Amino acid sequence: MAHWVSLRWIGHASLLAPLLAGCSDERIVFREPVNPPPDANSGFLGYFTATDKQTTCGNCHIGHQRAWLNTAHADAYATLAGSGSAQTFCYSCHTVSNKGNATASPAGWEAVADTAYHDVQCESCHGPGNTHVQEPDAPASAGNPPLAHVGVLGDSATQARSCADCHSGTHHPFVDEWAQSAHARSLEEEPGVFVADNPSCASCHEGKAALAAWGVTSNYAERGLTGSENFLGMTCAVCHDPHGSAKKADGTPLAGQLRFPIDVPDANQNLCMKCHQRRSEPDATAARGPHSPQGPMLLGDAGYKPAGFDPDVQAVASTHGSERNPRLCAGCHVNSYTVTDQATGAFQARSVGHLFLPIPCLGPNGVPTTDKTCAYTASARTWGACTSAGCHGDATTAAAAFTLSRQRMDDLTREIWDDINADDVVDDADGGYLADVVAIPPAEFLATDGRVSPAEGARFNVRMLRIVHGGDGSSGVHNPFLAEALLRANIEELKATYPGLPALRARVQEIMNGPLGAVTKRPLSRPLISRPITAR
């Protein structure tokens, strides 16, 4: 882009004086790519030309300017103005102001309501850019260059509120919900078990490490800070690119400024599955159990496959991954809805799905909570994620299907292994087939024999499909027909491998004799990219 600035002819007087005699005009051949900031006190520059949304920053940072134009941030002012519900206090989050950056006092639009400050521009997150454009080559110092923060909690000197300044509150509680979610607590694998400093865990438990693992090279305020006090959870900017969305195969940007797609059934490319796929099959050289196998489970490719395992791949792979649920994980775990007063219809609150709970318990005002102890009934929880695609007709139907699936999983897993003393070790104090197998020589639970025995494979699947640490976490609901197919095959293999095991309980035998759940076949949204289920 050409910019016109003043160019003066200057030369050595002895050589140029004859040429310049009588010459007093000045020709305009360039223009400085910077306008004086409307709010000179803060140094917020804003738009270079507001009519075509050319930011001052974008005169040099061309790639970021181009990507930003495709975001909702670039139309934030017009969106608010055209909403019919704009209030004066709303504009600071739809313009360049002190919201979203480290500027403490009212600045930008809050100080000077100029069109140069319309929309959520670069400086909304980075802070004032005037010092940087005046001294772009100056050694790095506080505020120059102005770096945005990836942290959002604002609970330390190195964590500004950034996104939280605007993406919070009753109408858009993204950070309010996120702060209660497991993504905010990712530094610990479970309460008291800190894992963010473990190199093998950090890329999925610490925000900066995740960005590095995904090849993000953009600089930000916390990037070079070391020490556990500067660790970040899975904050907004880990999943969302503030500069603009990644592109689909056809060149169009992804929705929501996401770094990776959420609708691709490939565990290595799907945003959620980049972490939720760590260990979904047993390791013949170690006794480690499953760890975050949700992605492969959803796609129909998780678990130990007993000998001859060859289920109806269409059924097990398409349970929650069919064309009716194109957003896959996010289709159930990121569900937005508005709560209104039942008597008047007036707005009360909004949920934006950033607790990442598919069927959360409801508080007295109808807003989801992090409580996981309420009943699995149509009234105690919200089932909107289950009913919105039309797969489950209403909340009562969805709750009944969920309860039935969990009961079948409980019956099958306890028949295989009931860890009565809750020590996660198969021993003779437990119940189920594995408690009988553990007493049979030679030992069937050796991590050093280079094989996965039928007993070890069954143990892996039970660990994966029960609500236990590291497992699928849904009691098989991510893919109930794959879960049931695996457990039924485990039981058959155990009976064939270890003669003398007792007869099955009556209701388990009934499950074994019946069809594989109430399978309703639907076509996959696209062919599986991950490895299909095959017999071993």
Where are these regions (language model features)?
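Sec-dependent bacterial lipoprotein signal peptides
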Residues: 1-21
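Short sequence/structural segments immediately N-terminal
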Residues: 23-308, 319-347, 356, 360-363, ...
